[in-house]
Amino acid sequence: MKENLIYSINGPVVKVKDTDAFSMLEMVYVGNSKLMGEVISITKEFTTIQVYETTTGLKPGEPVFPTGQPISVTLGPGILRNIYDGIERPLEEIAKESGAFIPTGSAVEPLDTKKLWDVTLTVKVGDHVEGATVYAKIPETDMIEHRCMVMPGMSGTVTEVKENGQYTINDVVMVFTDDEGVAHECTLTQKWPIKTPRPVNKRLPISMPLVTGQRVIDTLFPIAKGGTAAIPGGFGTGKTMTQHQLAKWCDADIIVYVGCGERGNEMTQVLEEFRELVDPKSGKPLVDRTVLIANTSNMPVAAREASIYTGVTLAEYYRDMGYHVAIMADSTSRWAEALREISGRLEEMPAEEGFPAYLPSRLSQFYERAGYMENLNNTNGSVTIIGAVSPQGSDFSEPVTQNTKRFVRTFWALDKALAYARHYFAINWNLSYSEYIPDLERWYSKNVDPKFMRDRQELASILAEETKLMEIVQLMGSDVLPDDQKLVIEVARVVRVGYLQQNAFHKDDTYVPLEKQLKMMEVILYLNNRCQQVVAQGKPIRTIIETGIFDEVVKMKYDVPNNDLSKFDYYYKKIDAICASID
């Protein structure tokens, strides 16, 4: 047998002087340590391989072993509550074997092969099965039922089914025979290539919001289930904290959190916090619905790309079971930097700011895997992608931010000035937008209140008017404004501080139901209307400010508990009483 030997090594890029043995995007094992790699280029003379582990100690002349398979992930029960690296190696298992750092060539099974699962079979002999047909159900965690499915693209008639009971992931629990008479054994797991989207029947129109309990998002810039969002912001503006908050409280069934090139301490924080926090709907620990993929900044650069695709493949697998999945990618800029580094080592022609010319197509391949889908088994599920972008120096005109804007429909722009003024979330309402609002109007009208979107529009117009007036105030001071415009600035302050700003550490303010958000909006708009009537009668705005009513309305987010909205009546009476006393 002809050996395929390493010819050259340049960081994570390895060249082999042979082109017959390999195919494009094939997974290979490089060197005597069997480092995982992927074929990314084949020319007449050389095969180029991108290695997903550190190549320190690798020498020319060492063998490269082809596998004939693309890079794939193992899908089955046990994914949830786990923490993986970018190529689906379980970090907790590796830590038990070899400590805090991953040894090169470490090959640990992604899922526990010895654990027994309680399996309930849902098919019987003689049943016809096809791609994504559920043949077994397993309680994976207290919150999530795992549904084992036939591989897409396969079909046949069931010839053998095991009894309900306890099985490991590699036990055969069902056998079916296809139309050509070939028997296929089904265990509790399957493998799927990470760069191939899992097939669906069709995309469905987007119609439901991903409810996050964060007022600035749910009210002003909502994201839909199956939607895409970007969170761009400079250093220290709160991208990671925003994603942590969304991962904790959004109403997705499953969270996939991908830490791509960010600090390791942030992944540790997610692990520790999610074990302590309780899901408000089920009362179970949040970690029961979460899978973490940690590819921190000190891990091999090439694996950042794999971590993004691994995360979205796991998300699609749970979507096929009929779940709504949200994937947090923090941060896509680090992935783009990895593309730039490898592109430079391959001596490709750079495009804008040194990024490769194929950056937009790679970003689109990732974001287009989001969607609200009808699955092959006729269930409905969704994948929602929320990607953080880290533009250097908060420059939103750089290529990653600009190309991301082309593929996402919600844009939450984080503002350094707001962040340093301790305004959390630091989402700038002038730069941010959501294109899902027309799609979600019917849902808000039916499930919350027909007035919700109208009130939202009024709130947005108050903020827009304040922005215009602040230009005059900064030039000439607020004293030159007439009272009706001073009122706009005062009410806008109530909106900013009392509504948009949120306290992640307060028990009633960290997560706010939509009903409470609506009531808060209505109180602020009622205050605005009553004060307009008082000012229109010629009474000075100063007399209203001195009553302290604006500050009292700001504090209602803390004073009204989420489970007792009747206390909002007090604010209507107080506003009426104060306005009547001024009259």
Report the location of each language-model feature.
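Metallocofactor- and cofactor-centric catalytic cores in central/energy metabolism, strongly enriched
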Residues: 45-47, 69, 154-158, 232, ...
